[in-house]
């Protein structure tokens, strides 16, 4: 196939039975990453409407600057913490084969974009700030504080039942504090734990994350 250019669609896949279906949010980028992994590409390029990954959301912080290079781990952490340029699952196929990903702007071809790779020369410190909106905080204090192992198992079972995963979960002598992206299934989770303990809820929060290397040093 040398010298040939193949064009295919993203976002479309198939079930185990071969029935065509969509693959979910950001699956066009994911499709490119999977194909890149399959052919062991030298680079995977994702073309979008921004110059790359920025030090902050440029729609919120006008002084934000684009990042020329960052590691897979940093990009994965940023995506997980709310950065919109790449979905976390897009990075995984590239990481398996150590294939660099370059984010390019289809409206600004003069920009070389952001290169995501395994190793870069970088000083310690923050690389970028990510924001995840519509976060809910749940403070849960169980009525029966004597049997935490069973309580922990029950809570984990509810996470699995409603297909939710906390952004953060901290336990202390008073109970457990959860942070979740506020999706409808979280409300069912709250309803169930309210039957076995007292809950305090704060909504319309944002989770702000600093991503980088040895930030506290």
Residue ranges and their predicted role:
Residues 1-217:
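C-terminal catalytic "cap/lid" subdomain
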């Amino acid at each position: 196939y040398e010298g040939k250019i193949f064009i295919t669609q993203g976002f479309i896949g198939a079930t185990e039975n071969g029935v065509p279906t969509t693959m979910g949010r950001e699956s066009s980028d994911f499709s490119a990453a999977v194909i890149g992994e399959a052919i062991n590409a030298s680079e995977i390029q994702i073309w979008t409407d921004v110059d790359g990954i920025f030090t902050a959301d440029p729609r919120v912080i006008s002084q934000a600057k684009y990042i020329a290079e960052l590691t897979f781990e940093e990009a994965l952490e940023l995506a997980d913490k709310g950065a919109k340029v790449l979905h976390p699952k897009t990075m995984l196929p590239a990481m398996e084969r150590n294939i660099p990903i370059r984010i390019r702007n289809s409206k600004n071809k003069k920009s070389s974009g952001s290169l995501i790779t395994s190793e870069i020369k970088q000083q310690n410190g923050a690389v970028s700030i990510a924001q995840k909106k519509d976060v809910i905080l749940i403070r849960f204090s169980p009525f029966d504080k004597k049997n935490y192992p069973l309580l922990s198992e029950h809570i984990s079972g509810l996470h699995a039942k409603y297909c939710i995963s906390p952004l953060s979960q901290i336990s202390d002598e008073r109970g457990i504090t959860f942070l979740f992206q506020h999706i409808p299934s979280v409300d069912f989770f709250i309803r169930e734990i309210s039957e076995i303990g007292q809950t305090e809820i704060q909504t319309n929060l944002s989770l702000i994350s600093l991503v980088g290397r040895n930030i506290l040093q």
